[in-house]
């Protein structure tokens, strides 16, 4: 399957059309951003690591019965995916307090959240992805009540699968975001799962093994991503 026209260029990925109107090529670039794109740097191997990491995770979720857009790994930095009608709202699950939750509520970083929190955010960089709720989604027509309920169900199911996967690898799944779309009327998991859109801490040291290393200028971003991949058994080379 060959990529054709560039359809969309995001902060770290580019989407291309193919000869099949139902399929797209997703290219992972080496770009890394923070502050809604205000700060951007490039890191060698990042596109490759995230592409193979994402394919690995999507395969695990598909094995658990979660419908995903993933079709095939095409190259080190490209994968073939179903074309989805994306929902403009992203889902976030929080197993521990971190990031914006700590700032918003003034709570201690790292405390366990039981049951996990479920948040919704409107995908809009200019407005810094404002938090919304089910009522907003219904009133503004972003997603139907039924499809939103399905998104929440799949997000919590993914959390159950991934918490165990990372725990077995000596990592804490602190939080993560998922994006969904519709494929022939069905709610399907899209976009990506990688250390770019999740928080992962070492169980013993609580070292941050995700994009917070870039956000907080801790250094060692790619080394952390590759370490996580190796612990999970992701084949990078």
From Swiss-Prot:
EC number(s) given by UniProt: 6.3.2.6
GO BP, sorted A to Z: 'de novo' IMP biosynthetic process; cobalamin biosynthetic process
UniProt keywords, alphabetically: ATP-binding, Ligase, Nucleotide-binding, Purine biosynthesis
The protein's annotated pathway: Purine metabolism; IMP biosynthesis via de novo pathway; 5-amino-1-(5-phospho-D-ribosyl)imidazole-4-carboxamide from 5-amino-1-(5-phospho-D-ribosyl)imidazole-4-carboxylate: step 1/2
Gene Ontology CC annotations of this record: cytosol
InterPro entries, per database record: SAICAR_synt/ADE2_N (IPR028923), SAICAR_synt_PurC (IPR033934), SAICAR_synth (IPR001636), SAICAR_synthetase (IPR050089), SAICAR_synthetase_CS (IPR018236)
GO molecular function: ATP binding; phosphoribosylaminoimidazolesuccinocarboxamide synthase activity
SUPFAM superfamilies noted in UniProt: SAICAR synthase-like (SSF56104)
Catalytic activity: 5-amino-1-(5-phospho-D-ribosyl)imidazole-4-carboxylate + L-aspartate + ATP = (2S)-2-[5-amino-1-(5-phospho-beta-D-ribosyl)imidazole-4-carboxamido]succinate + ADP + phosphate + 2 H(+)
HAMAP family (UniProt xref): SAICAR_synth (MF_00137)
Homology family: Belongs to the SAICAR synthetase family.
Protein name in UniProt: Phosphoribosylaminoimidazole-succinocarboxamide synthase
Gene behind this protein: purC
